[in-house]
């Protein structure tokens, strides 16, 4: 006869799953964002050249749309946590991936226009680099330490 498991409230199961999920996603996204942020800050010229090449290619815009939409949707489906703590960062990043992916897939000409406008201002690479790096540090901290 199989042993019966003790009763565990559903809210506790969901919360444990979400915390484990959050930690994994923070460990995954945090270091990537740190590297991206540092790269944008120490070599903005390389990022600018990459962005200019990207904006000249509809195929790359399309692929980038898919590469933003798929993981963004995966995050939204598995981590749609609207609690005001560090986990909200992951949820917002998921939704930004979905929105950004859809925008790239449906409106590639607007992506080119907006991207070209942003590249015309050098500070538009340094400021996002600092933000991305800071988000990476926060996520890495909570993913590995906190």
Regions found by a protein language model. Give the residues of each.
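Membrane-interface extramembranous regions
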Residues: 5, 9-146
């Amino acid at each position: 006869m199989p042993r019966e498991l003790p009763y565990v409230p559903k809210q506790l199961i969901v919360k444990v799953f979400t915390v484990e999920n959050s930690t994994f996603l923070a460990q995954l996204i945090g270091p990537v964002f740190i590297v991206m942020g540092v790269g944008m800050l120490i070599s903005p010229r390389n990022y600018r050249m990459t962005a200019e090449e990207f904006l000249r290619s509809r195929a790359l815009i399309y692929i980038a749309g898919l590469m933003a939409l798929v993981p963004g949707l995966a995050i939204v489906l598995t981590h749609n946590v609207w609690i005001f703590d560090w986990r909200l960062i992951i949820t917002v990043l998921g939704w930004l991936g979905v929105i950004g992916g859809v925008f790239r897939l449906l409106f590639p000409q607007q992506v080119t226009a907006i991207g070209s406008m942003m590249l015309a201002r050098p500070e538009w690479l340094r400021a996002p680099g600092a933000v991305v790096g800071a988000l990476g540090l926060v996520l890495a901290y909570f993913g590995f330490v906190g």
